[in-house]
A protein has these predicted regions:
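A broadly tuned "polar low-complexity/structure-edge" signature
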Residues: 69, 87, 150, 162-164
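Hydrophobic/aromatic-rich core segments of domains that either
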Residues: 54-139
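Hydrophobic alpha-helical segments
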Residues: 14-17, 52, 66
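Active-site-proximal helix/loop microenvironment
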Residues: 49
């Protein structure tokens, strides 16, 4: 119902994606006592979540209208991780969207932008957990996992050594 209502108010696919971004900005709170994977149902009921949970809501809304979307995970030099989304439109390519910056840009001004100094570099595209979209069958995202080791220099720059890559599409 939510996806259809947003779609009906949108001019085209990119307008729909921006309206989904604004929906998450207005309807969900960023922050969770315990970070980590939570079900989509949990996030929808509680109207809050961490970066991955809020990205999952955005991604699911896009996929409900057959717009390709995926999770991206970045590793920061301080050791923390951050998750945001990408979605694909033929005339534009992959467009980044970080719904957690919505509090600073509630007018949608951050839509389609990413600050890599805050997000770090990408170590994973996709999350391999099945996503249950209310009454529809389970869907899952692609998974790319990298085994890596990080060493810090005196200048606090991270060096990454990628030793293995495992890919599995549509688990």
């Amino acid at each position: 119902k939510i996806s259809k209502a947003i779609w009906d108010e949108s001019k085209d696919a990119i307008d729909y994606a921006k309206n989904c971004y604004l929906f998450v900005a207005k309807q969900f709170e960023y922050g969770e006592k315990e970070s980590g994977f939570k079900s989509l149902d949990y996030t929808l009921i509680n109207r809050k979540g961490d970066c991955g949970n809020l990205s999952s809501v955005f991604i699911t809304l896009l996929r409900m209208q057959d717009i390709p979307a995926r999770h991206l995970m970045g590793f920061r030099p301080d050791g923390s991780l951050h998750v945001w989304a990408d979605f694909y439109l033929q005339d534009y390519g992959w467009i980044p969207v970080d719904v957690t910056y919505k509090h600073d840009y509630t007018d949608g001004g951050y839509f389609g932008k990413i600050k890599f100094k805050h997000n770090g570099f990408i170590v994973q595209r996709g999350i391999g957990h099945p996503i249950n979209v209310l009454d529809s069958p389970k869907r899952s995202t692609g998974l790319q996992t990298y085994t890596y080791q990080v060493a810090y220099t005196k200048e606090e720059r991270a060096k990454v050594y990628i030793s293995r890559k495992v890919e599995c599409i549509e688990v």
